[in-house]
Amino acid sequence: MAMVVFLLLYLCGHPQAAADNIQTLYVPSGESMEMPCPSPPSLLGGQLLTWFRSPVSGSSTILVAQVQVDRPISDLGKADPDSRFKVLGNYSLRLEGSRDEDAGRYWCTVMDQNHKYQNWRVYDVSVLKGSQFSVKSPDGLSCSALLCSVVPARRLDSVTWLEGRNPVRGHAQYFWGEGAALLLVCPTEGVPETRSRRPRNIRCLMPQNKRFSFSVAAPAEPPPTVCAPLPSWDVSWILMLLFAAGQGVTIIALSIVIWRHQRAQGTQDREPSIPHFKPEVQVYENIHLARLR
């Protein structure tokens, strides 16, 4: 009999609940969430608590988990070991690591032998995403585009952009579309130099106090256009410079002395030998001159 009821539920598609009974939930991509299911007023044997979901991409109804309400709490758990859905002890449905395809409508029902639905709870789950990329402005500046979006697409009028606790400073442009809010941030003007070099922390505040934080890198430091200041000379540098200069002068002076000495010695080696005075030749010449007289 329970199988027949399940088939009827499968063919019915979306639950036709009142708008007041549908709760909208937002979950950031990659995070976990829980969807409570109220306990039935009376626990009877054979009652089944079932969780269904209907993806955004189609109208089909998918069975997520089904447990008996009179079973011990310790026996509850994942319907599939590889599934990211888990039924907790209070019959809440836990979703681990949300993805885009998890967006859609979820609801829980309690079926008894009379095939009545009791205490159903319907949730419209939307997955929030945050993206950041770089763009070039018409002036050639490197700007950052910060995007906060929701799946399925719905208008996000309640998105607030903050830098720290204050509005975003500098030249910022805001854009809103169906299912997305975009902030274009360019380098700030008129900001002190030391402050402008720090990364900027910008937050996107979304419904139900969900938020994404972005870190916008500081603009690259332009190359210096002025000459670097001359280094300051202290006493130790001056003494070292004088010592090096004195050593250089001494080496040059010694080199000159050695070079002159070697040059003088080389000149003496190249000059012809002077003949020595010979007394006998001079005596002979004097005698010869005396005879001629």
Swiss-Prot record:
Topology, Cytoplasmic side: 259-293
Main location as per UniProt: membrane
One cellular-component annotation, GO: plasma membrane
Domain of life: Eukaryota
Topological category with respect to the lipid bilayer: Single-pass type I membrane protein
Signal peptide: 1-19
Ranges per topology, Extracellular: 20-237
Glycosylated position list: 90
Residues annotated as domain Ig-like V-type: 20-124
S-S pairs: 37-108
Record PTM: N-glycosylated.
InterPro entries found in the cross-reference section: Ig-like_dom (IPR007110), Ig-like_dom_sf (IPR036179), Ig-like_fold (IPR013783), Ig_sub (IPR003599), Ig_V-set (IPR013106), LY6G6d/LY6G6f (IPR026524)
Modified residues (Phosphotyrosine): 284
Transmembrane domains' residue ranges: 238-258
Subcellular location: Cell membrane
Keywords: Cell membrane, Disulfide bond, Glycoprotein, Immunoglobulin domain, Membrane, Phosphoprotein, Signal, Transmembrane, Transmembrane helix
Cited function: May play a role in the downstream signal transduction pathways involving GRB2 and GRB7.
Quaternary context: Homodimer; disulfide-linked. Interacts with GRB2 and GRB7 in a phosphorylation-dependent manner.
Protein name: Lymphocyte antigen 6 complex locus protein G6f
Source organism per UniProt: Rattus norvegicus (Rat)
Gene expressing this chain: Ly6g6f
